[in-house]
Structure formats: structure tokens, C-alpha cells
A protein has these predicted regions:
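General beta-strand structural signal in soluble alpha/beta enzymes
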Residues: 34, 109-112, 159, 185
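Glycine-rich, flexible N-terminal cofactor/catalytic loop recognition
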Residues: 1-58
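Short active-site oxyanion
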Residues: 26-32, 104-108, 156-157
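A contiguous loop/helix-start segment that scaffolds small-molecule binding in enzyme catalytic cores
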Residues: 2, 156, 163-276
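Glycine-centered tight-turn and secondary-structure capping sites
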Residues: 92-94, 251
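Loop/turn-to-beta-strand initiation segments
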Residues: 3-5, 74-79, 155-156
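Class I SAM-dependent methyltransferase SAM-binding "motif I" and its flanking Rossmann-like core
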Residues: 95-153
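Conserved helicase motor
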Residues: 55-63, 136-140
Length: 276
């Protein structure tokens, strides 16, 4: 009989948030798979947990995943931990979970901290419907395409961001959603210097361009407001793009302008107009 893979959520800053059940799970597992063994050993030492550690991260997940699967199929149990938060959520652990599911290995979640949910809860923005977008890519083209696809998104949006990329990300968010869109910037959640700044994208972009940030951020951005006027279809949007083209505007610029006023995707408008 195969063993069990336990997804053990770890603290995102405050060790007091680690649950007794999580401690018990780590103590009873045959071995622990960690994103960074140097980080996880500090957690284990704090709770006096002595268990074998193996490395499982973005750069070795294929080979390490197969090795972990083999041990699980042999009947061992494994606790998967990430440096902070819930494994397999915006994390290479999702590949290990998929591998286990495909091979009939039982997977159980040991719940705990999740920075995205904590940030959403304190943001003051609507929580009934939301979308988690994780980290934006550093590739400029892919990054803009990602944001452009969210232009008409009405749900609250959640992003993770590192301090050295925050200013550029805020500028891109402002340029995509407009300077008046509401945002909550949650910094150092559960840590000593935890802070939530509630403002607009325009103000946030200006502030952090002049004040280099410190600490990890979760960005919670308000969704688009429902338009009170008539909804513009893609076909109608394309007609608007073509009309601007006839006035001498470049196709790319025309698609962007119509997208800003209608909430339609700039890329879809551009492609559809190009094929006309």
C-alpha cells in the first residue's frame, strides 16, 4: 500500500502560527521534502523535530519528484513544505501533487497560513469573488499580455511581488487599470513590521517610485466596475478600431485605445482587426 503525501502549510512570518497538527504531521512523517532545506531546518529546530530532509524545488522538481514518488509508492509518508505558506499554491509542489494523483497516491492538506487569503481579508476590498494571479513574469511582453487579459476582470485580483520589482509592477498596474483603481498593499504579513496601505494605483506608483520599498508584498487590486451603459461586443470594438485606423492611427494604438474604453482585450481587438 502506498504512503501519503502531506501538504503542510508553514508560517509566513510568525512561528506562533504553526499549528499543533502541523507539528505532529512533521514528527510522524518518514521524511520531509523542502523547498529550501536551509530555511526549513530552522523551523524544524525551533519545534525540535528530527526528520530526514530532501530537497524539492523549481530547479529539481522533475528528478526529485520521481524519487519522492518512488518512496511514497513503497509505503513511506512524506511531508511537503515550502519556505512560507501553503505548498502547491503558486509553487512547484503542484507538479508533485499531480504526479501523486496520477499514480494513486493519497494527498492530504494540513492547512495553515496563506499570504494571499490573509491579504484579501485585511484589504477592505470585496472578498466574495477573487482571482489569484501570483507573481507576474519579468518578461515585459508576457507581463503586459497577462495584465491586458485582466483589463475587464470584475473580481478582486491578488498578486505577489518582491520589493525590487514593486515600483515597475505598480506602474504597469496603473497603466493597465487606470490611476484611480483601488489597491491594498500588504507588506510583511504576520511579521513585526506588518503594514497595509490602502490607496489608488496612481498614488501607490508615485509613492514607491520615490520611496524604495522593503519586505515582501501582496497586492490586492479592486476589480473593474460594472459598466452601466451597453456592453460592447468584440465585433463592435473591432469596428471602432477600424474607424480609428481610417483616421490615421496605428492599429496597435487604436486597439489599445478601444480596449481602455470598452474593457475588451487589446490583443483580441488587434488580432480580429488584423484579420479583417
Amino acid at each position: 500500500m502506498s504512503g501519503t503525501l502531506y501538504l503542510v502549510a508553514t508560517p509566513i512570518g510568525n512561528l506562533g502560527d504553526f499549528s499543533p497538527r502541523a507539528v505532529e504531521t512533521l514528527e510522524n512523517a518518514d521524511f520531509i521534502a523542502a523547498e529550501d532545506t536551509r530555511v526549513s531546518i530552522k523551523l524544524l529546530n525551533h519545534f525540535n523535530i528530527k526528520k530526514p530532509l530532501v530537497s524539492y524545488h523549481e530547479h529539481n522538481h522533475v528528478s526529485a519528484g520521481q524519487a519522492i514518488l518512488a518512496r511514497l509508492l513503497a509505503g513511506e509518508s512524506c511531508a511537503l513544505v515550502t519556505d512560507a505558506g501553503t505548498p502547491a499554491v503558486s509553487d512547484p509542489g503542484e507538479d508533485l501533487v499531480r504526479l501523486c494523483a496520477e499514480n494513486g497516491v493519497r494527498v492530504l492538506s494540513i492547512p495553515g497560513c496563506c499570504a494571499a487569503v490573509n491579504a484579501l481579508a485585511v484589504s477592505g476590498l470585496p472578498t466574495g469573488r477573487f482571482t489569484f494571479e501570483g507573481f507576474l513574469t519579468v518578461n515585459k511582453k508576457s507581463r503586459r499580455e497577462h495584465l491586458d487579459s485582466l483589463r475587464g476582470e470584475r473580481r478582486t485580483m491578488i498578486f505577489h511581488e518582491a520589493p525590487h520589482k514593486l515600483a515597475a509592477t505598480l506602474a504597469d498596474l496603473r497603466d493597465t487599470f487606470g490611476p484611480d483603481r483601488q489597491i491594498a498593499l500588504c507588506r510583511e504579513l504576520t511579521k513585526l513590521h506588518e503594514e497595509t496601505r490602502r490607496t489608488t494605483l496612481g498614488e501607490a506608483a508615485d509613492y514607491y517610485a520615490a520611496n524604495p520599498p522593503k519586505g515582501e508584498f501582496v497586492l490586492v487590486v479592486a476589480g473593474a466596475q460594472q459598466e452601466t451603459g451597453a456592453v460592447v461586443t468584440l465585433e463592435e470594438g473591432v469596428e471602432q478600431v477600424l474607424a480609428l485606423r481610417e483616421q490615421g492611427m496605428r492599429l496597435k494604438d487604436a486597439a489599445r485605445e478601444v480596449a481602455e474604453h470598452t474593457g475588451l482585450s487589446k490583443n483580441e481587438l488587434y488580432t480580429a482587426a488584423l484579420n479583417r
